Amino acid sequence: GGTLREIVHAVREASAAGKGTFVHLDLVRGLSSTDKETVEFVAEYVGADGIVTPKSHLIKEAKRIGLYGILHLFVLDSLALVNGLKMLDSIQPDGIEIMPGTLNKVIKRFAEASDKIPIIASGLIQTTAEAADSLQAGATALSVSAPELWSCTFDDLIA
């Protein structure tokens, strides 16, 4: 997360390094995380490749204007799992960010239910072993805050 200014700087820096950039709308101070105008702002002024949000209407708006829309899900119980699988069918996100990312059983269920939608494991992934476990469960990408994992490649994690 960060301020709007920090996010713009981080997106520019990451883009210049050839990285894909996604803005998690709930984590940016200075932007509404509920309005479609925020998605338009991210596309036009921030320059990110996509957004991350738990809000289905914002994912639909992102896709409409050419951004990737990543569905952010907290899967804390069986009901959240069932509802998340229903959302997968109804909004067709470009990816799914599952939290916590160490829930390999949940990652596997989503990976089996969505063979074409990338699964992003996120939250509580702090070691290379946890990162590798998430990938082996079916995650196709990771979103991590641990700096020691930022330079890891898939080859480093899957042997």
Where are these regions (language model features)?
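Short, acidic/polar
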Residues: T34-E40, S78-D89, T127-A131
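Alpha-helix-loop-beta-strand connector modules within alpha/beta enzyme cores
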Residues: I7-V23, K36, E44-V46, K60-H72, ...
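Structural motif
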Residues: Y45-V46, I65, S90-I91, A137-G138
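Alpha-helix capping/helix-boundary segments
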Residues: H57-L58, E148
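Strongly charged, low-complexity linkers/loops
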Residues: N83-A111
